[in-house]
Each structure stands twice: as structure tokens, then as C-alpha cells.
Amino acid sequence: MASKRALVILAKGAEEMETVIPVDVMRRAGIKVTIAGLAGKDPVQCSRDVVICPDASLEDAKKEGPYDVVVLPGGNLGAQNLSESAAVKEILKEQENRKGLIAAICAGPTALLAHEIGFGSKVTTHPLAKDKMMNGGHYTYSENRVEKDGLILTSRGPGTSFEFALAIVEALNGKEVAAQVKAPLVLKD
């Protein structure tokens, strides 16, 4: 069986932990991850001034699709940039139409709202993004640290990044693989 594939869309101002932790955990699970730079292949400055080098531009990565999951990290500016991108809208619409998994964390789910993705789903966000996410009544809000409703998987923030990443692994590769990846991470239960 071919390994699963993930597209992580990296925008300027993305939250570092919400980008790197899911990438690392998914790669540990054997998922082929592509970090795609929204603005190209140049290094991206994240919300706390960590610089991440994308594997490809979003334009080039899109040509290699479809992906088993599209991941949207948070960070206020990063989420705003994802929300304003026509390319992100196109990728999310294609992913939704083909019934592929979409995962977003922290403020990242607000890009789902901006692009009208997953309406009717139960979601969670960073507490500061809750009001924005609930504007218009398109979603049901959950206070859970990670919420999976069908093919929409959301999480709350930097402190839930490992749980978010492991939920993606479980959705793509099953509980057993997620447990195998989790064990050596020495996470608190």
C-alpha cells in the first residue's frame, strides 16, 4: 500500500509549533509530508520569528495532488493569509469535493469559514478565534482539545499540537500506528 500524503500550507505568520509538530509526527508515521509555501519556495517567517523552509511552492505542490490530508496551521497572521488566498480556497474546495481530510488548528479553522468549507461541522479553535469562527452560525462549537467531525479535524492551539498531529495520524493510518508513534514521544497521558 502506498504511503499516505499530507500537504501542510505554510503562510507568513504561521504558528511554528502548529506547523513543525504535525509535520514531524506525520513523518514519524510514514506519511509523506510536503510543506508548501503559500507565497513560493522562499523561507517563511513564522509568528515567533522562527524561519521554516518550504519543500515546495504551493503552486508546485498543488500539481502533485491530491493529498490524503490538507493541514492548515494557525497563528493570527498566518490564518489571515490562508483566509485571503484564492489558491488555498481552490485546494480546500477540491479536497472537500473529493471527500479528503482537512485539518486545521488554532486560528487556522477561520480559513475554513472564509472559504466556506465544512459548513455544519462541529469544530474547535483557539479561544480567541471562537467568536470569529461562530460568526454566521455555520458551525457547532466544541471546547474539546481536538474535534473530528467527519472529514473536518480541528484543534485549539500550540499546546494541543501533539494531540492534533496524532489525530491526523490515526485518521490516516489507524489507532495502532498512532499509538506506536506516540509511545517514544514521552507525552503526558
From Swiss-Prot:
<dbReference type="GO" id="GO:0050727">
    <property type="term" value="P:regulation of inflammatory response"/>
</dbReference>
<dbReference type="GO" id="GO:1903427">
    <property type="term" value="P:negative regulation of reactive oxygen species biosynthetic process"/>
</dbReference>
<feature type="modified residue" description="Cysteine sulfinic acid (-SO2H); alternate">
    <location>
        <position position="106"/>
    </location>
</feature>
<keyword id="KW-0256">Endoplasmic reticulum</keyword>
<keyword id="KW-0496">Mitochondrion</keyword>
<keyword id="KW-0395">Inflammatory response</keyword>
<feature type="active site" description="Nucleophile">
    <location>
        <position position="106"/>
    </location>
</feature>
<dbReference type="GO" id="GO:0006979">
    <property type="term" value="P:response to oxidative stress"/>
</dbReference>
<feature type="lipid moiety-binding region" description="S-palmitoyl cysteine; alternate">
    <location>
        <position position="106"/>
    </location>
</feature>
<dbReference type="GO" id="GO:0030073">
    <property type="term" value="P:insulin secretion"/>
</dbReference>
<feature type="site" description="Cleavage; by CASP6">
    <location>
        <begin position="149"/>
        <end position="150"/>
    </location>
</feature>
<keyword id="KW-0449">Lipoprotein</keyword>
<feature type="cross-link" description="Glycyl lysine isopeptide (Lys-Gly) (interchain with G-Cter in SUMO)">
    <location>
        <position position="130"/>
    </location>
</feature>
<protein>
    <recommendedName>
        <fullName>Parkinson disease protein 7 homolog</fullName>
        <ecNumber>3.1.2.-</ecNumber>
        <ecNumber>3.5.1.-</ecNumber>
        <ecNumber>3.5.1.124</ecNumber>
    </recommendedName>
</protein>
<dbReference type="InterPro" id="IPR006287">
    <property type="entry name" value="DJ-1"/>
</dbReference>
<dbReference type="GO" id="GO:0005783">
    <property type="term" value="C:endoplasmic reticulum"/>
</dbReference>
<dbReference type="GO" id="GO:0005737">
    <property type="term" value="C:cytoplasm"/>
</dbReference>
<feature type="active site">
    <location>
        <position position="126"/>
    </location>
</feature>
<dbReference type="GO" id="GO:0045121">
    <property type="term" value="C:membrane raft"/>
</dbReference>
<keyword id="KW-0865">Zymogen</keyword>
<feature type="modified residue" description="N-acetylalanine">
    <location>
        <position position="2"/>
    </location>
</feature>
<keyword id="KW-0558">Oxidation</keyword>
<dbReference type="GO" id="GO:0034599">
    <property type="term" value="P:cellular response to oxidative stress"/>
</dbReference>
<feature type="modified residue" description="Phosphotyrosine">
    <location>
        <position position="67"/>
    </location>
</feature>
<dbReference type="GO" id="GO:0008233">
    <property type="term" value="F:peptidase activity"/>
</dbReference>
<dbReference type="GO" id="GO:0010273">
    <property type="term" value="P:detoxification of copper ion"/>
</dbReference>
<dbReference type="GO" id="GO:0036524">
    <property type="term" value="F:protein deglycase activity"/>
</dbReference>
<dbReference type="GO" id="GO:0007338">
    <property type="term" value="P:single fertilization"/>
</dbReference>
<dbReference type="Pfam" id="PF01965">
    <property type="entry name" value="DJ-1_PfpI"/>
</dbReference>
<keyword id="KW-0645">Protease</keyword>
<keyword id="KW-0539">Nucleus</keyword>
<dbReference type="GO" id="GO:0005739">
    <property type="term" value="C:mitochondrion"/>
</dbReference>
<dbReference type="GO" id="GO:0005634">
    <property type="term" value="C:nucleus"/>
</dbReference>
<keyword id="KW-1017">Isopeptide bond</keyword>
<dbReference type="GO" id="GO:0016684">
    <property type="term" value="F:oxidoreductase activity, acting on peroxide as acceptor"/>
</dbReference>
<dbReference type="GO" id="GO:0050821">
    <property type="term" value="P:protein stabilization"/>
</dbReference>
<dbReference type="GO" id="GO:0042803">
    <property type="term" value="F:protein homodimerization activity"/>
</dbReference>
<dbReference type="GO" id="GO:0005829">
    <property type="term" value="C:cytosol"/>
</dbReference>
<dbReference type="GO" id="GO:0061727">
    <property type="term" value="P:methylglyoxal catabolic process to lactate"/>
</dbReference>
<feature type="lipid moiety-binding region" description="S-palmitoyl cysteine">
    <location>
        <position position="46"/>
    </location>
</feature>
<feature type="lipid moiety-binding region" description="S-palmitoyl cysteine">
    <location>
        <position position="53"/>
    </location>
</feature>
<dbReference type="GO" id="GO:0106044">
    <property type="term" value="P:guanine deglycation"/>
</dbReference>
